[in-house]
Amino acid sequence: MKNTNFEMWVADCERNNIQIWQLDYDKDTDIGIYMTKSSYWYNNNQYYNSPVYQLWIGDKRSICMENYQEVYKIWERLVSESKDR
């Protein structure tokens, strides 16, 4: 059984200790926004990298950026356009 791109991405994040949160998802259009966040250790202190927001349309990652407002605007537009068809 072949894994989808999304499943491979999730497995890769788990393997690299990158946390994933599903922020928004529209079941009808299969478009979702996910936030990933990673951390690292330096001098016995744990630091977190800036979160990265990823827009997935079906099984394809379409957009990846650090600005949630921009990703959310694009997500809203895509969901709206898909439902208008």
What is each model feature region?
Residues 4-19:
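Extended non-catalytic interaction/regulatory regions in multidomain proteins
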Residues 15-77:
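Acidic, low-complexity, intrinsically disordered interaction modules
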